[in-house]
Amino acid sequence: MDRWIKITVEDVASYQAGAFVKALESKAKYSEQQENPVEVAIERITARIRSDVKSGGFSVDRDTDKIPAELSPDAIALVVEFAKPRLTLKLSDDERTLAAAARERLDKIATGKIKPSLPDNPEPAAESVQSSGGCALVRPARGTPQRSDYAGL
């Protein structure tokens, strides 16, 4: 079994009623040119999870669609929270609780308190680290000047 997985529309449908996913795919679209709202929600939540994993100083998978497998229930809860208002439906208390717990867990990962599983195909560090822009840090002189520092002046 892979340690990092891709969240799909079928995963959301199995977590939530399939009718909810069908309604999102048909009723929540304004036009035929608009993307599937469930796929957009999955894409945005996946990006947030990967960002939180990177913020914690952990490696991510090369495939930008993959997240740690243990975070899939959290991702699906956040996808539902993100997508449900598009149908002008209110979140249930359980859905709110699950989404809040998911955000709390992601915050702990971002601060390094929880370690996610290692990626199957890690992204090289050079790809995930921003360049500094070439700015040099100026440091103050070490210590307090002593009498010997002024000898000969």
Briefly describe each language-model feature range.
Residues P73-F82:
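Elongated alpha-helical scaffolds
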Residues W4, E81-L153:
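Short loop/turn elements at secondary-structure junctions
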Residues M1-L71, S132-L153:
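Conserved short "hinge" loops at termini or chain/domain junctions
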